[in-house]
Design a protein with these regions (language model features):
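Collagenous Gly-X-Y triple-helix signature in extracellular proteins
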Residues: 1-160
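Charged/polar, solvent-exposed surface patches and flexible loops
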Residues: 21, 25, 29, 170, ...
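Alpha-helical tetratricopeptide repeat
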Residues: 161-172, 195-198
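Short, charge-rich amphipathic alpha-helical segments embedded
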Residues: 177, 181-198
Length: 198
């Protein structure tokens, strides 16, 4: 996706942002109930220490969520090398305005993406540019969105549509077409299931 952090020029407060609301509603709808149940809830209790130390940061109200954006501190912890922070926006994101530095004809390149931490000014939010460098942008700018979540690795994934697709493909390859078809029928309109049946 390619979205603004906020719909209007206002303070970059993650819990109150339009982008957070989109993740909790529209993005949530992309998951089946079984998939959503396997996403572990997390309490985001961002403090001033989670933001870029070169900018003024304040503590945020703790909030429980399932899907979120990484904070500045999390990026430094999990993606310490600038090269690791580069991400190529999807065709969907590019069609909605995501910046793309590279070769669009072959889909190789990088895209800017939001972090949930405040930026340098009160109406700015932190982001990573196409080089993987930390920057600050006005909250009304449209940038790439890279959702983050914590999965419960002990969850039974057999009910996940992707796992069911894999099982159906294996059954079809073994010649058990009736069982494969029955499994695909349970997937309904899940994206990609029709292509697998061909």
């Amino acid at each position: 996706a390619c979205l603004p952090f906020h719909d209007e020029k206002t303070d970059a407060v993650w819990n109150q942002s339009a982008l957070n609301a989109w993740l909790q509603a529209d993005f949530h709808a992309a998951f089946t109930d079984a998939e959503w149940a396997a996403i572990a809830p997390v309490t985001l209790a961002d403090t001033a220490a989670d933001g870029n130390p070169e900018w003024q940061n304040t503590d945020a109200e703790p909030a429980e969520t399932h899907v979120f954006l990484l904070s500045y501190a999390q990026v430094m912890q999990y993606l310490p090398e600038q090269e690791q922070r580069k991400v190529s926006g999807t065709e969907y994101a590019r069609s909605r305005g995501a910046k793309f530095l590279g070769f669009t004809t072959i889909g190789i390149g990088e895209t800017d993406w939001w972090l949930r931490s405040p930026g340098k000014e009160s109406y700015d939010a932190c982001f990573l540019d196409v080089r993987g460098a930390v920057g600050t942008k006005c909250v009304t700018e449209k940038l790439g969105v890279r959702p983050a979540l914590w999965m419960d690795l002990s969850a039974d994934r057999n009910a996940f549509p992707y796992e069911q697709q894999v099982q159906a493909k294996q059954l079809a390859e073994q010649g058990d077409y009736a069982e494969a078809t029955a499994l695909l029928d349970t997937l309904g309109d899940y994206a990609g299931s029709a292509a697998l049946a061909e």
